[in-house]
Amino acid sequence: MMANILGAGVYSDIFFVAFKLPNLFRRIFAEGSFSQSFLPSFIRSSIKGSFASLVGLIFCIVLFMWCLLVALNPLWLAKLLAYGFDEETLKLCAPIVAINFWYLLLVFITTFLGALLQYKHSFFASAYSASLLNVCMILALLISKEKTHLEALYYLSYGVLLGGVAQILLHFYPLVKLGLLNLLWKGFLSFKTKNAAKKKYRSKRIKRDLKGFFKQFLPSVLGNSSAQIASFLDTTIASFLASGSVSYLYYANRVFQLPLALFAIAISTALFPSIAIALKNNQQDLILQRLQKAWFFLVGVLLLCSIGGIMLSKEITELLFERGQFSPKDTLITSQVFSLYLLGLLPFGLTKLFSLWLYAKLEQKKAAKISLISLFLGLAASLSLMPLLGVLGLALANSLSGLFLFVLTIKAFGFQLFLGIIKNLKSWLVILFLACVEILLLLAFKSWVTHLYLFYYFQGF
């Protein structure tokens, strides 16, 4: 829908730049950076209501002040996000940045409420909240279909905010039902107690809990979000390239994220509690056994996705995006970017698996260090390849960054343990067989489609 109305040009670039930072936070929070640091601290806290309400209040105040600062003067952030845009484009971009930036506050509230629901093993609201954002954005695009591109940008931006509000509202019913809203309210009221002894005890416990939470939070964010930050930096660099480059990266990355989220992130999220418990009980053999099963499953699935995606990149892009303002030229470039992104699917996905070991051992600082090194190496690759390959160089550099991240994570995990996990000839032969079958089937399918197209073309259909 977005490709149909905005295409891949200056207006789509403006929106993707404006939405990039809020979307970065959405993806970081959604992939567990907040929950992995908040939930352990929340579970250990003896004053859960006070701790949760204070964490929520601190984040909301800080984010509100940032949003207000950007709303009052959005041009500086627009320049920071897209330094390569000319002055006229930056002036168009600034108010769109100001509107979209408020989504940061909304997405934090959604994530915070979702983390509380996870404590009660309630996942429905978190699972479906993302779809509400998409629904609101689609409705905004439908309403603005007959408007100018600039007007459509404003409709779409307000659609993002409406989606954020809808995401928050979706969480309220389960929060009330499970008594969590009442817990937050009581926690907030507890700060008004006049009992000096209780106040001193609560203050001491809160300081300890907050220190533990923030000690884990920042490294967890850095360690979990190297792919997202790399993509964010690529957007800024792409603003120096030809019009449409930011859009090509965005459209290709959206499709690339699908198998990563469906398989790698989902499996690592589900596996984390059992790995943490087994590590606590010194059951290393059990951990390695589970990691081995997950390894071969992910290698098989992600390899098949990569092969299929690369071989059908043009067809996938054409099917998803080529209509309205999205031209065949846009399809060609986006499909090439998508293919280069897919080269990094295996390393990025498998890194998610082995980083569980570091987080279960509470080595968030080591994970953050690895993430920063891979980011710097990826940034160097982007700056080196961009003059030669343009937007394609940025996509290739992103995949190289994933490879750096994977190698460094395996080094931290231990090469001997890693070699023990991947020793299974039977599993490798099965994966190789499936990959060969997929390649042959896709070649036959593409040949059949080509012959069918030529037949109907010469028949005059």
From Swiss-Prot:
Provide the GO MF annotations for this entry: lipid-linked peptidoglycan transporter activity
Entry keywords, A to Z: Cell inner membrane, Cell membrane, Cell shape, Cell wall biogenesis/degradation, Membrane, Peptidoglycan synthesis, Transmembrane, Transmembrane helix, Transport
Q: Which residues cross the membrane?
A: 5-25, 51-71, 96-116, 123-143, 156-176, 229-249, 258-278, 293-313, 337-357, 372-392, 402-422, 429-449
- Domain of life, per UniProt, equals Bacteria
User: What CDD domains does the annotation carry?
Assistant: MATE_MurJ_like
Matching entries from Pfam families are given as: MurJ (PF03023)
Q: Which family does it belong to?
A: Belongs to the MurJ/MviN family.
Q: What is this protein called?
A: Probable lipid II flippase MurJ
Which organism was this protein described from? Helicobacter pylori (strain ATCC 700392 / 26695)
